């Protein structure tokens, strides 16, 4: 037999915890939307060959532009291809690291009560 007010384990205290959890989830959702907009506007640069080739992507890894110096063009197609690929990888790594850091900032300290 359960005591008064205990019911199915969803007493007033649990309802407050649940309401707080929903409030925090809503805050995270709003923060995630703002973060998504911010990431879209970012320009993160990857480079190769000491700056001969630069690739600029958004915080969401969306390519924005590629800059190739005349010196890189003079190196020939094979080397240019390698430089572009290396710059793309560099930009991708920097962009994903930025996204991960921003997501950690958004969710740090998130304590869902009762879970």
UniProtKB/Swiss-Prot annotation:
Gene3D superfamilies linked to this entry: Nucleoid-associated protein YbaB-like domain
Keywords: Cytoplasm, DNA-binding
A GO CC term assigned to this protein in UniProt: bacterial nucleoid
Cellular localization per UniProt: Cytoplasm, Nucleoid
SUPFAM superfamilies registered for this protein in UniProt: YbaB-like
Pfam families per record: YbaB_DNA_bd
Main location: cytoplasm
Record flagged with keyword Phosphoprotein: no
GO molecular function, one term: DNA binding
PANTHER family: NUCLEOID-ASSOCIATED PROTEIN YBAB
Purpose of the protein: Binds to DNA and alters its conformation. May be involved in regulation of gene expression, nucleoid organization and DNA protection.
Quaternary data: Homodimer.
Family indicated by similarity: Belongs to the YbaB/EbfC family.
Protein name per the record: Nucleoid-associated protein alr5067
Organism listed in the record: Nostoc sp. (strain PCC 7120 / SAG 25.82 / UTEX 2576)
């Amino acid at each position: 037999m359960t005591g008064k007010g205990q019911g199915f384990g969803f007493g007033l205290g649990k309802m407050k915890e649940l309401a707080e959890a929903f409030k925090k989830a809503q805050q995270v959702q709003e923060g995630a939307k703002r973060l998504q907009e911010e990431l879209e506007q970012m320009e993160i640069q990857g480079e190769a060959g000491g700056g001969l080739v630069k690739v600029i992507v958004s915080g969401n890894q969306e390519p924005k532009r590629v800059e190739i110096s005349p010196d890189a063009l003079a190196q020939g197609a094979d080397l240019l291809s390698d430089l572009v690929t290396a710059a793309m990888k560099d930009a991708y790594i920097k962009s994903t690291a930025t996204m991960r850091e921003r997501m950690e900032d958004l969710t740090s300290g998130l304590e869902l009560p009762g879970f």
